[in-house]
């Protein structure tokens, strides 16, 4: 959770790298966000927290606002090393997909006839498509 300094000297707390930066700029400068960020920095310093700090905004990094077509929301965050990487239900390549993701694949296959490799649970390509 490193801060970046802009050319005007103002510290930028988040750098997503696309249009989300402008859309959320006021939020990232707000008092509630500063408190939340301080809390998270402390948590990351004291505990094993998932996803890694540099992955927190991956969903926004991979999907610019103008490209969003669907939003997936998860209920139970991943809590093991190598699982969470900032995309709901997704796990990095080489990590077996959890049952919840396999259920999603099964439902999509049932409804739309689309086949999935059940051994790959990395959804970055989905995020890039919106």
Protein language model features and the residues they cover:
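N-terminal amphipathic/basic-hydrophobic helices that include classical n-h-c signal peptides
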Residues: 1-11
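A polyanion-binding, active-site-adjacent surface
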Residues: 14, 26-130
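C-terminal accessory regions appended to core domains
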Residues: 16, 20-21
């Amino acid at each position: 959770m490193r801060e970046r300094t802009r050319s005007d000297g103002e510290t930028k707390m988040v750098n997503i790298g696309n249009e989300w930066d402008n859309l959320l700029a006021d939020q990232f400068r707000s008092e509630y966000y500063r408190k939340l960020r301080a809390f998270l920095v402390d948590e990351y310093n004291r505990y094993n927290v998932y996803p890694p700090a540099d992955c927190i905004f991956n969903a926004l990094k991979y999907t610019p606002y103008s490209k969003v077509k669907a939003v997936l929301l998860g209920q139970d965050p991943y809590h093991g090393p190598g699982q969470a990487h900032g995309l709901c239900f997704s796990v990095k390549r080489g990590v077996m997909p959890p049952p919840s993701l396999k259920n999603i694949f099964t439902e999509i296959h049932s409804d739309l006839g689309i086949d999935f490799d059940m051994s790959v649970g990395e959804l970055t390509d989905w995020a890039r498509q919106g």
